[in-house]
Amino acid sequence: MSIVVLKLPDVKVKSETRPTHCPSCQGEILQRWGGQVRRVRDPQVSSAQVYRYRCCRCRHTFRHYPAGVDQAQQSQRLRKLAALCWRLGLSYRGIAAVLAAFRVGISRMSAWRDAQEMAGQLKRRRIWKPVRVLGLDGAYVRAWGGVRPVLVAVDLGEKQPVAIGYVDEYNPQAVRRFLEPLVKRLGVSVIVTDDLVHYKTVAEKLGLEHQICQFHVRRWVGRTLKELNSGLPQEWLWVIDEIKKLMAELPLEGSKRFYELWKQIPIGRHGRMHQPLSALDQLRQLLLRLSEHWPQYRVFDWQPDVPWTNNGTEQVIGRMKMRSRTVRGYKTQPGLLNGLMLAGTSPE
């Protein structure tokens, strides 16, 4: 059984060091200018000694707090603990009840603000962190009286969410507006997505390598071949076996081979508009699609750090959906995006 250790910030009663410089002018000659005992909301510490210092250069005075204490009434440890409790499934009312058992009283709104603060810290921590391989996928969550679309971007190296946008993945213009700043800021060079055609269009416009999730590809190809197996003429069943072999081996020349197979299938729809496709016509379409998208199926083969599936993104979205089912519904767009960011982040 695996054990997860969650480290919370330490809270000191008194600062063990003096400040090294003035925050205004960076002056190094500082004079202690009084102090006071401040009450703190924390499970273990009830008060802390806060000193004020005066800079001898600019005469600016400032407070110097002990570790784990800042301007807020709650300690950093309590705020992180409240956000962690929400991440693990407690409601804001439940968080207040649990902390009351430790003789620390906070309101539901304080717990909500703690969760929003933690989500903001996660965003700021990752806003400039380089990401080479980015996973993208859409999700639908319950918010303000309906089901809302969101687009989730995940660092597939660390399996952590990077950004979440209120974007419909079926709108290529919106996807590009969401993705382009991330590409420029983080240095993204490869995206991993499902087989939705809009992602291919956006990747080409932004000059990105595009890996299509092999799980999605093999699933829809397998379903299509199963349907065609019963409708194809007997003399063309060997093509199905050839497709299965190519999908299993993923050879470099697969695109050329699919195109050769496509040219061998006779055209059977001349003059038959608005009629259902025959099994041979469906086979031709399948071969042409596989030939055109073959480079996007095997980027992982020549770039070792690119995964061949988008499972990392799916896992993050799974955590988001599990938490969204236990909340009453997000009321605002910022609350929705912050809640999903916090829920999708695995404990560090």
Question: What residues fall within each predicted segment?
Answer:
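Cys/His-rich metal-chelating microdomains
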Residues: E28-I29, T61, V98-A101
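RNase H-like nuclease fold core
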Residues: R54, A101-V202, E209, R289, ...
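Short, charged amphipathic recognition helices of the HTH superfamily
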Residues: L88-L99
